[in-house]
Each structure stands twice: as structure tokens, then as C-alpha cells.
Amino acid sequence: SFKRGKSNKVALLQLATEDKCFLFRLNKIGLTASIARFFASEKIKKIALSSKDDFAALNKRRVIAQKNVFEIQQVIGNYGIEELSLQKIYAILFGKKITKSQRLSNWEADQLDLKQQLYAATDAWATLRIYLRLLEIEEQLKRDYHLDINSTEK
């Protein structure tokens, strides 16, 4: 059973693309060689938020290389955002709240209920949306900076 403050193994791995989310029950399938290869791949960019503890816990099961991982918490301050939680960063960037009511749920349950599945998928999807929004901000800053340089040369 789940208890607040108790350290648990990473039970669930959430992966999101722009149109799909995949939930891997690590407590059921384990940390497979395929998952380890995924994290070790230089070709696949992995976007994470608050992943340090999760990677530490995963490495207790099986040492995995972490290549091409973009950790949002390491760069979010560069965008003038001091918050580090997914919910707060999302609210700042999009002006909308995402629910975190299932956070203290039992992720090792035999079956995840629909609320848990939606929470986990939303968590992964929101992380990807944050990353894509940061890229948009970066591009806008580049365009603005370029325009500013051109306007001062006239």
C-alpha cells in the first residue's frame, strides 16, 4: 500500500508523443533491456521534469545510461520561471491548471483505474507541451533579437 513519505520504486514509466501516451507498468514488467536501450539512445530525445530521483531509483534496479535527456527543471529558470513543479510551470506557461489529485495514488495496484491512467498520461503530455512551449519561446526570442539588431543598424 502507498504511504506518504515512504520511498517507493518507480512503478510507472510514462512516454508521450504529440498524439499518443504510453504507460509502462515497471512494477509488472520490470526495467527491461528495451527500456534501458531507449534511455541510452542518442537518437531519441527524452523530455523530463523532476527526473533525478526517478533515475536514481531506476539505477538501483539496473544501471541505465541516460543519453539525450532534456531536464526541464535545469533550464526553466532561464525563462524567468522560478517554480519547479509541473503543475505550476504549466499554469504559468498556459494559464490553465492541470489536476494532480491522483499524485498520491497507489501506482503499484494490480490495475490502474481510469483516473490514474488519465493522470499519468496528462503528466507526460503536459511535460511534452511545456518543452514545446519553451522551444516556441526560444524561437520567438531569436526572431525578436534578430529584428532588434536589424532595427538598430538603420
Identify the meaning behind each predicted range:
Residues 118-154:
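Mixed-charge, glycine-rich, non-catalytic linkers/tails in nucleic-acid processing enzymes
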Residues 3-100, 104-119, 126-133:
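Conserved DEDDh/DEDDy metal-dependent 3′-5′ exonuclease domain
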